[in-house]
Each structure stands twice: as structure tokens, then as C-alpha cells.
Amino acid sequence: MEKAFRPHFFNHGKPDANPKEKKNCHWCQIRSFATHAQLPISIVNREDDAFLNPNFRFIDHSIIGKNVPVADQSFRVGCSCASDEECMYSTCQCLDEMAPDSDEEADPYTRKKRFAYYSQGAKKGLLRDRVLQSQEPIYECHQGCACSKDCPNRVVERGRTVPLQIFRTKDRGWGVKCPVNIKRGQFVDRYLGEIITSEEADRRRAESTIARRKDVYLFALDKFSDPDSLDPLLAGQPLEVDGEYMSGPTRFINHSCDPNMAIFARVGDHADKHIHDLALFAIKDIPKGTELTFDYVNGLTGLESDAHDPSKISEMTKCLCGTAKCRGYLW
């Protein structure tokens, strides 16, 4: 497969190359990313002759869909910290909703850290154990802040941290692995896609030939949803991210009942809580070449009882993760 694309690259680099064909080329889409030279994405198939869906498009940021409400500019605000170091402490406005640190890693002075990441030593830049275990939301600084792009509280904003390889598995379609070691607590990448309304998500489910299959690619942005919220953007039905036809490499990550990564809600500008990022962090050390996985249905209950109900089992989707902790069914 890799050899077959060498002339493909060459032809797309010619002045008379077909622009439409180049635009729809997965390899050209990947090569256009600013991070490609340092953190390349590769596609490898050593199992069969399958190719990625030609209708799929690689993107490096989520796309806001039709009728998706966005916060008014007057509600947007960033921190006014005098230095990047200030963005680790309770005085940083971006961290107002983070719980103060209370472990042995806390600042030795009077100020308490609310910062989600370790700030020094071998764990610098990794997600703190407290946050990793609780899966509480992560609040970061952003482009509207006074701090620099090197601020230690802009981990997710700076983007993917490792090269990734999309590969063909023996029995689960495409999967993703990393050619370098990943540390526990390390940010890997975001789950990207088209951000759509709940009504549009339901319409797409209804139009899908296999509704349950569509759910594999739809993720609700419901971390902050609250029908009693005074913020109308949070009181309504949550938006959803559809990664089926436009996404990044994480779209191809498979499910596991014993995963090595987990999704965290990451907030930049607090006015954008309803369209928060879905950030993937390693929850254990991941040796290079290991398939990356996360739990598609983390927190879902009732699967075991449904699996023993003859009226429901025929509609359930079998899990193929093959781990010792496999629940038997995805949903």
C-alpha cells in the first residue's frame, strides 16, 4: 500500500495536477497539516486491499455545523496573568472552576495551584493523578489570554504531541497505534469532527442504514449540560461531534473495555463550554507499537442485564476488544 502511493504523491506535486483529486486525497490532506513534518500521520495496511472511505476527509480542527449556536463576543474573556507562571495558580481567571490542589505537589508558598498538569520534573506537562483518576473537566488558557503560547496551561491547545499510525487490524477494521512510547497522563490528541445540533444528530442516525453504527462516530458534548442552567447554551440539548466523514486520526481508534486512554472535557474560553474539546489522555504507560484504545461507552450501565434479556440481545452490538475485562457487548 505504501509503495502504491509513491507515484501518487509525485503526480499530485505536478503543476498540472487535478486540484479536485488532490483536495480529496487523504495523503495530501495529512501532508497539509502544520504538524506533519515533526509529528507525521501514516496509513498502513498489511492485512488486505482495503482503503479508507474516499468520502472521508482529514481535518486538524473541528468544524462548526449549521444552526450551531456560538457565544456572543461580549461574553468572551481570557486571563490577564502577568507571566506564564501565574497561570498555574488560583489567581488565574481561566482556573476559576478548577478545584484547588491539596496533594504533596501543591505549591510550597501560600498560593494554591489549580493547574491540571505537573509543572516540574519527569512528569512536567502530564495530567496530574488527581485529575486523571477523577476525569474532571480541564480548564486551560487560550488565544484570548494575556499569557504566551508557551504557557504551561495550554497543553491541549498546542495540539497533538505524538506521531500516529492508522493501521489495518486483523478483525476490527482500522485501528491506531503510536511509533513512540506514551507516558501515563500525556495528552495524545483530540477527537475532531463536525459539531452539530442534537436534532441534526438524530436525523443522521435515522438516515444511517445501521443506526447503531452511526453512534460509533457521534459523541455528545454533554459534560456541562444542565436543564436548570441559566446559560441557554448549556440548558438545551447538548451538541454532538460527528467524526464519520471528517475527523482526525483519532476517529480510527478502536474501543476497549480495558482501554489505555480516556476522553476528558477540555475548556478554553468559558463561553464555549457547550462546544468543549474531547481530549484524549493516556491513563497508563503505553509502549510504542501498542494499539491505542478508549472506552466508547465509559459510564454506561445496564449492559450485563440487557445481555441476558432475549428481547434485547439480538439488537446489541458485540464487543471484539478481546481483553480479560471485556463486557461482551458495546451497547
Swiss-Prot record:
Effect recorded for D222Q: Reduces enzyme activity by 97%
One of the record's GO molecular function terms: histone methyltransferase activity
Binding annotation for Zn(2+) 1: C79, C81, C87, C92
Enzyme class: transferase
Positions that bind Zn(2+) 3: C87, C141, C147, C151
Function per UniProt: Histone methyltransferase that specifically trimethylates histone H3 to form H3K9me3. H3K9me3 marks chromatin regions for DNA methylation.
Protein family per UniProt: Belongs to the class V-like SAM-binding methyltransferase superfamily. Histone-lysine methyltransferase family. Suvar3-9 subfamily.
Protein's recorded name: Histone-lysine N-methyltransferase, H3 lysine-9 specific dim-5
Protein species of origin: Neurospora crassa (strain ATCC 24698 / 74-OR23-1A / CBS 708.71 / DSM 1257 / FGSC 987)
Gene responsible for this protein: dim-5
